[in-house]
Amino acid sequence: MGPTSGSQLLVLLLLLASSLLALGSPMYSIITPNVLRLESEETFILEAHDAQGDVPVTVTVQDFLKKQVLTSEKTVLTGATGHLNRVFIKIPASKEFNADKGHKYVTVVANFGATVVEKAVLVSFQSGYLFIQTDKTIYTPGSTVFYRIFTVDNNLLPVGKTVVIVIETPDGVPIKRDILSSHNQYGILPLSWNIPELVNMGQWKIRAFYEHAPKQTFSAEFEVKEYVLPSFEVLVEPTEKFYYIHGPKGLEVSITARFLYGKNVDGTAFVIFGVQDEDKKISLALSLTRVLIEDGSGEAVLSRKVLMDGVRPSSPEALVGKSLYVSVTVILHSGSDMVEAERSGIPIVTSPYQIHFTKTPKFFKPAMPFDLMVFVTNPDGSPARRVPVVTQGSDAQALTQDDGVAKLSVNTPNNRQPLTITVSTKKEGIPDARQATRTMQAQPYSTMHNSNNYLHLSVSRVELKPGDNLNVNFHLRTDAGQEAKIRYYTYLVMNKGKLLKAGRQVREPGQDLVVLSLPITPEFIPSFRLVAYYTLIGANGQREVVADSVWVDVKDSCVGTLVVKGDPRDNRQPAPGHQTTLRIEGNQGARVGLVAVDKGVFVLNKKNKLTQSKIWDVVEKADIGCTPGSGKNYAGVFMDAGLTFKTNQGLQTDQREDPECAKPAARRRRSVQLMERRMDKAGQYTDKGLRKCCEDGMRDIPMPYSCQRRARLITQGESCLKAFMDCCNYITKLREQHRRDHVLGLARSDVDEDIIPEEDIISRSHFPESWLWTIEELKEPEKNGISTKVMNIFLKDSITTWEILAVSLSDKKGICVADPYEITVMQDFFIDLRLPYSVVRNEQVEIRAVLFNYREQEKLKVRVELLHNPAFCSMATAKKRYYQTIEIPPKSSVAVPYVIVPLKIGLQEVEVKAAVFNHFISDGVKKILKVVPEGMRVNKTVAVRTLDPEHLNQGGVQREDVNAADLSDQVPDTDSETRILLQGTPVAQMAEDAVDGERLKHLIVTPSGCGEQNMIGMTPTVIAVHYLDQTEQWEKFGLEKRQEALELIKKGYTQQLAFKQPISAYAAFNNRPPSTWLTAMWSRSFSLAANLIAIDSQVLCGAVKWLILEKQKPDGVFQEDGPVIHQEMIGGFRNTKEADVSLTAFVLIALQEARDICEGQVNSLPGSINKAGEYLEASYLNLQRPYTVAIAGYALALMNKLEEPYLTKFLNTAKDRNRWEEPGQQLYNVEATSYALLALLLLKDFDSVPPVVRWLNDERYYGGGYGSTQATFMVFQALAQYRADVPDHKDLNMDVSLHLPSRSSPTVFRLLWESGSLLRSEETKQNEGFSLTAKGKGQGTLSVVTVYHAKVKGKTTCKKFDLRVTIKPAPETAKKPQDAKSSMILDICTRYLGDVDATMSILDISMMTGFIPDTNDLELLSSGVDRYISKYEMDKAFSNKNTLIIYLEKISHSEEDCLSFKVHQFFNVGLIQPGSVKVYSYYNLEESCTRFYHPEKDDGMLSKLCHNEMCRCAEENCFMHQSQDQVSLNERLDKACEPGVDYVYKTKLTTIELSDDFDEYIMTIEQVIKSGSDEVQAGQERRFISHVKCRNALKLQKGKQYLMWGLSSDLWGEKPNTSYIIGKDTWVEHWPEAEERQDQKNQKQCEDLGAFTETMVVFGCPN
C-alpha cells in the first residue's frame, strides 16, 4: 500500500468518526405556542434527544431586538424524565408592545448548557375574554339597561384587570365610556345605564376591552324600540327543513300559538308563502290562506301546483338554489293582540343533503389509512343525523352521528400523487341521482430527504365528554431497517391556544401500532389537538423529524356545574305575587348572576342572549390552530396546530405572521322572501329582460294612469316599451271583465252595560319585563361535588312565563351558563289590559281589557269596572262609576273595549277591576300609559361651534355665547329640553408611509477591503438594521435575517480595527496619514452600532479624544490633514466650498452622537462641542450652500441653539418648504434634506415635517450605488428618527366649562385624545342662553339642540311648487292588514312651477296620528320599469308619529305628477291630528310647498262617541260656559275666591287666531278685578289659548267682553310674555255690553257683574 492509499484510509477514518459523532450528537428542541399571549401563563416544552446525563436549560424571553429580558426560567432535563420537561412562562405587558404598530414578536432563547436555540415568536394581546350579559334583549326609551361584564382569563377563570366599557349608538357613536377595575369583584362587574327618553332607535352596542389590549374587543347588542310586550308567541315549523323539488308533496308547516303563560291560543292565522331569490322576495299570491288556530295549533300547506304556477319560468330547475319562506300573522278572536312570525331559508333542493370536508385533513400519508371526517348537513346547515355515507371505489361506509359527522377510513396507494376522493350519501328512498355527492383532493405529506418515514394518528369517532378515555392509535411506517431507532413518540395536547399537556408514548421494538389511552378532563372542552412526532437519524445520516396531528371535538358543556330548578315538593300553580322557591346548584364558592325575564321579551327579540354555546364559539374563534389536523410536512403539522418548533440542528417551523388563521372565502348564502305572481302572458316572453318589462306592465298601481302615460317613464329601449304596452293593455282589458270584492271582517259581540256597585279589589300593578337582577354566592359545603342555595322569592304581578337565567363564575371551574328555568305564572280568572306604547294628549283612543276564564266547566258572570282617573276623559267620571256585566264561557275570553281621552302629559294610570258573581274571585290590573304632547316634536339646532382655543382666540381661552332657542311656536303646557353636546375631534397625525423594508436587502452586504472600503460596505448594513428596527419591518424582511446582519456588522467592526492607528485614528491604510473625516464617520457608525453589537467604548472614545486633541483648532474649527482616497464616500462635503463649516458640523454631530458613551471618559468633550458650536453660530448667517445650512443646522439643533435668527435662515433656505436643494445634485440633496429633517424633529416642528418626509419618499431613494454612502446613511437615519418621534395624533387636552344661569356652579368637561370621540351631553329643561369657555389644546365641536313640541300651523306659503293633497276612504275591495281599523287612500299631486322639470325632488310626509302607510303600495311604486318613485324611507327615531320620505327622480313642469297609496289606521283615535306633505327640491331647499290633510269630520268625530256624560267628559278640559240663569252674585264670589284662583279680569276679545291644534284669543284687559302672578295693567293685551276641541263649547266672538278668571297653574310662559290656558277650571262668562243691557234677561246679570266687581275691588276675597 503506497502513501496515497494511506492518506485515503485516514480520510475514511475521519469520515467514519464524524458520522459516529453525528449519530451521537443530541438534538435539542423547544416547542411553544406560535402565538404567545401577554399576561398569560404559557407552557414551553424542552427536549433533548440522544442526550447523555443531565442537561441544564435556561429559557429567556426577550423583546425582539433583544434589548430587554422580559422573563426567564430554569429547569433540568434528566434521564428519569426522558430528557423531556416544561417551563411556565408569563410575559408581562409593557409599553414595548404598543398595540397600534403592527404585529409584535419576542425572541425566545433556550440555553441547553452551551448550546443555544433561538426563535422569534408572535405575540398576542389577548390575555382573556370579556362576556357581557344584559338583563333583556330589547328596551324602550327611558328604561334602564342592567348588564354584567364577566372578566376571565384564557382558562375562563375570573381575573382582576382594568376594563374599558363603551356604549355606542346604532350609528357607532360612543356616548358613554367607563374605565373600571374587576379587582376584588370576583370577575363580575354589575353595571347599569339609563336610556334617555330622546334616543335613536335601533341596535345599540356595549363594547368592552381590557385596557392593555384595546384592539381585542368584545361586545353585546341590545335593541331600543317603542314596543308593547305581546301576550302570546307564534312558532312556525316546516315538517322538513328543505323542500325537495322533485317530490310530489307540497311544503307542510305547522303553526303553534301559545300564550306566554302556557295556555293555547284560539284565533285566526293568515298565511302566505313565497320564494326568495337573493334579496328579492316573490310572494305567491294564490298561497294566501286563512287558517283557524284551535287549541294553539294549525297547519298550512303550499301545494306544488301553487308554487309552480306562481313563478316564471315554471320549471323545477329554475327554482333550485332559491328558498321558500312562510309568513304568518295570528290574531286573537278578541282582536286584542296580534303576533307576526316568519320562517325563512327553507332551501329548494334536488338533494336533501350537503356534504362538507371542513373537518377532514388536507394531507395523507401514502400507503397508510386516511381518515375522512365527512360532515353532512341538511340544506339549512343543521347537522343531518343517521345518514349513511360511502366513498366511491371503496367499501368504506359509515353513519353520521348526532353532530352530522361520519368517519370513513380510506386505504391510500403507495405513491406520492394527489389523492382524489368522492363521497356520497346512501339514504334509502332517494334515487342515486338525487343523493348528495362531493369530491375532495388530498395532497401527500412531504417527508424529509424524500424518505419513507411516516406517522399517522387515528382516533375513534365517538362523542367525547369529560371522564371518558380516548384511545389514540400511533401508526408507524419507516424506511427499511429504520424502525428500531424509534423508541418513543413525543405527544402534545393543544387546547384554547395553550399547551395543555406533553408526554412520551413508549414504543417497543417491532410495534407498528401503539395505542395511547388519553383521559379526557374538563380542560379539554370544547376541542383539542393532539400533535405527535418522532425523530431519528435517517438512512442518509441526516437528522429527520416526522409528525402528525389530529383535531378532536369534545361535547360542549360547562367545566363546572350550574342548575336552576324549583322545589320538587311544591306542586302548586305559581300565582302572581305569591312566593315560590328557587334551588341553585353549582360549585362551592361560585358567584351566580341571576335575572328573571318575561318570555314576551324573547318573542320580540331572541337574539343576543348569553348562552354557554356562545361562550364556546368565542373561545373556538380564538383558537390558534388553523386546520382539522395533519400538515404538508413536519413543520406544517406543528404550524397548523398552533405550535412553533426549533432545534439546534436547523430544523424549525416557518414564522407565523398573523395571530388569526387565514379566513376561507366566505360562502354567499342566499336569503329568502317575496314578489308578485307571473301570469301566462309573461311566459310568452322568453327573454328575461323583456319578461320583466311585461310583468311590470301588468302590475296594478294606485294612480289612475293610462298605459301610455306609464310608458313615458320607461328608459330601457323600444323593445321593452312594446312588451310593457302589450301586457299593460292586455291586463287592462282583463280587469274590466273580472271585478271581485274580497272583504274580511272580524265580528265582536255586544257587551252588557248594567251598572253595579263594586267592593274594593287590590289591583296587580307591578309588571317588570325583568327582575331578580342579583348575584348570589354558593357558600354551602359541597355534597357529591355540588353546593346548593335555596331562595324564596315573591313573583311579580305579570301572568306570563318567567325565564330564570343564571351565569356563574368560579375560581376553579370558570364560567358556566345554566339552561333557562321556566316559571309559568297564572290564575284561572284574570284581566289582560292591552295598552298602546303611547297616545297623544286630547286624542280619543280605544283600549281593550280582555277577561279570561280558564275554568274547565263553569261559565262566569263578571262585573267589570274602568276606574276614574282625572287625567283621562272616559265613561267613568268623578261622579259616576262605569260598570259592565258580562258572561265568560269556560276556557274562553271576552274583550271589553274602553274609549278614553288622555288630558295630561306623562305616565298615567289606567285601572280595570273585575269581580265574579257568587264567587270570591276577582282581579284588577293597573297599568301605566304614556301620554305625549300634541303637535310635532321638533329638534331645533340652536348652535354649532368649533372649539379650538389654541388657534381661534387670543390668550388660549375661547368664549362662546349661545342664545336661548326661539320657541314661539311651542305647544302650551309642554316642556322643552336643551341638549348641549360636546365631542372632541381626534385629529390623526398622518404619518407618511415607511420605506418598504424589503427594498433594503441590497444594503446588507459583507464588508471587505481597505479601511475606507470596509466602511463603505459596513455603513449601509448598520443603517439598514437601525431602520428596520425602528420601523419594525423585520417581519417583511425576514425575522431570521436580523441575526445574519448583526454578524456582518461584527465582522466589519473587527476588520475596521485592523486599520486603527496607535493614536486611535483611522485611514485607508496604516501607512497613510489619519483622516479626520474617516475617524468621525467611524465614530458615528459605531456609536449607532453600539445598540446592536458589543463595541469597546475605549476604542470608540479613543477616536473621539484624537479628534478633539489633534484636529480641533482654538477657534473650534476641525481641520483635515489626511483626505480620504475614496472621495465618493464623503457626500456633500466633497464640494470644497464652505468646507470648514461642513467638516466642523460633521465632526460636531459625531461628538454629540458619541456623547452618551464617552462623556465620562473624555473630559474635554463638552468644551470641544461648545467651541465648535460657537464657530458654527458665527458663520451660519453667511452660509451660501443649502447643504451646509442643513448640516450645520442639525449640529446647532443638537445643542438646542437653532434659534432665531438662525432658524429663519434655516427654514428660508428650503425650496418649496420641503427640500434643501442644489441643482443637479440628487445625492447631496437627499443627504442635506435628511440632516434638515433631523433638525426639524429635534425642534418638534411637526407641522413642517410632513412635506419634507413626503419629498424624501417621493425621491424613491433606497440607497446603494457609487457615491451613495452618506446619502444612504443619512436618509435612513432621518426616516428612522421620524418614525420614532412623530406622534400618531395631534394633542387633545381641553377643559370646557358650561355656565348655565339656572345653576349655581359651572359644569366642567375634559376632552382627551383617549376618549375624544365620546359624545358628552348636558341636558336642561330651562330654555335659557348660556356661555361656554374652552381652554387647552386640540379641537372639538359644540352642538346645542332644543327638543320641543311645535304647534302645527295650517297655512303655509308655497314657492315654485303647486301641491294638492286629498285623503278619502279606501274602497271595500282594497286589501288591508287584518288588524287595521280602517284604510284610506292618500292622493298627492304636484307640479313644478319652473321652466324645466325639477330633478331630485323629495316628498316629506308626516302621517296622521294612528296611521301608517301601506308598504306594499310603496314597493309597487318604487319597483318595475315604470318606477314612479326612486325610493322611500320611514323614520321613527325621534317621533311619536311616522314620517315617510319619498325620493323622486323628477317633478314635471308641464303636467301634474300624482302618487296614490293606502294608509291604514291601527288604533281608533278620536281627534285625529292632521298630517302634512312637504315637497322640495334637493338642489334648492328654499323651493318648497307644504299642505296639510285630514279626513272630513262628521260632526267633529268626537260626537260619534258621545254617550250619556261622555261628551261632557271628553270636553272636560274645556271650561263650562257660564250663563246668567245659573249663577248668583254670592256663587260668583265664592267661585272667584276658591283656593288656587290667581286672577280675575274683565276682558275684550280683539283677535282670534285658529290653528289645527290650538286656538289663540288675543284679549285686551279692560279691568284688573283681582291681580295675580302676572303684573298686567288695564289696556294691555294678553294671549289666551284653548285646545281646538273646545272651540264649539267656547263660541267666543270678536269684539265681545268677558268676565274671566283662572288658576295660577293655567299661566304659561315667561314674563312678560305670559299666556293663559283656558282649561276646565277657567271661568269665562259673557259680559253684556251697553246695547245688550236693553234686553231684560241681561239686566240682572249686568247688575250682578257690577256688584261682583265692586265687592272684589273694594273688599277682595276673605282669607
From Swiss-Prot:
Residues 693-728 form the Anaphylatoxin-like domain. The record marks A747, R748, S749, R959, E960, R1303, S1304, R1320, S1321 as: Cleavage. It comes from the Eukaryota. Residues 1518-1661 form the NTR domain. The keyword Lipid metabolism applies. InterPro entries: A-macroglobulin_rcpt-bd, A-macroglobulin_rcpt-bd_sf, A2M/Complement_sys, A2M_N_BRD, Alpha-macroglob_thiol-ester_cl, Alpha-macroglobulin_TED, Anaphylatoxin/fibulin, Anaphylatoxin_comp_syst. The record marks N1663 as: Coordinates Mg(2+) for interaction with Complement factor B Bb fragment (CFB). Residues 1634-1659 are annotated as: Interaction with CFP/properdin. One of its GO terms (cellular component) is cell surface. Glycans are attached at N939, N1617. Precursor of non-enzymatic components of the classical, alternative, lectin and GZMK complement pathways, which consist in a cascade of proteins that leads to phagocytosis and breakdown of pathogens and signaling that strengthens the adaptive immune system. This is Complement C3. The gene is C3.
